[in-house]
């Protein structure tokens, strides 16, 4: 479970990550990473639009992504990071394992984990 202190909730934080952060994409996801000078722990947020599917599909996709992200928090820098995971339409039909592979690939492309790290 992704604890409250690690959840990204405010519009301004999403904007910083989406507009000013580095970006890495896969077929199903786009990851946005920004480093802030705040003394907050690294926080993760999700954007799952109607393009992904209906309400049930969107919520299922977000739950899967939240579970994957919670398992990757230990590989991310401890303080000041904002990670936004934006789901593309193909994410709606992806399994949890496929989403995990895409998150790991995006984190490697952003330089946040070493090659081979975070798999699992």
UniProtKB/Swiss-Prot annotation:
Has the keyword Ubl conjugation been applied to this entry?
no
EC number of this enzyme: 3.1.26.5
Principal EC category: hydrolase
Q: Which UniProt keywords apply?
A: Endonuclease, Hydrolase, Nuclease, RNA-binding, tRNA processing
Record InterPro entries: Ribosomal_Su5_D2-typ_SF, Ribsml_uS5_D2-typ_fold_subgr, RNase_P
Q: What does this protein do?
A: RNaseP catalyzes the removal of the 5'-leader sequence from pre-tRNA to produce the mature 5'-terminus. It can also cleave other RNA substrates such as 4.5S RNA. The protein component plays an auxiliary but essential role in vivo by binding to the 5'-leader sequence and broadening the substrate specificity of the ribozyme.
Q: Which family does it belong to?
A: Belongs to the RnpA family.
The protein depicted here goes by the name: Ribonuclease P protein component
Q: List the source organism.
A: Kineococcus radiotolerans (strain ATCC BAA-149 / DSM 14245 / SRS30216)
Q: Which gene encodes it?
A: rnpA
């Amino acid at each position: 479970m992704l604890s409250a202190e690690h959840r990204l909730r405010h519009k301004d934080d999403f904007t910083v990550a989406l507009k000013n952060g580095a970006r890495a994409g896969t077929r199903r996801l786009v990851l946005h990473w920004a480093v802030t000078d705040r003394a907050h722990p690294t926080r993760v947020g999700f954007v799952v639009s109607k393009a992904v599917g209906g309400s049930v599909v969107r919520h299922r996709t977000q739950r899967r992504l939240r579970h994957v992200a919670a398992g990757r928090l230990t590989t991310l820098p401890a303080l000041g990071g904002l990670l936004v995971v934006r789901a593309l339409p193909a994410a709606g039909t992806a399994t949890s394992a496929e989403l995990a592979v895409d998150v790991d690939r995006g984190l490697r492309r952003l330089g946040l984990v070493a090659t081979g790290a975070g798999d699992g």
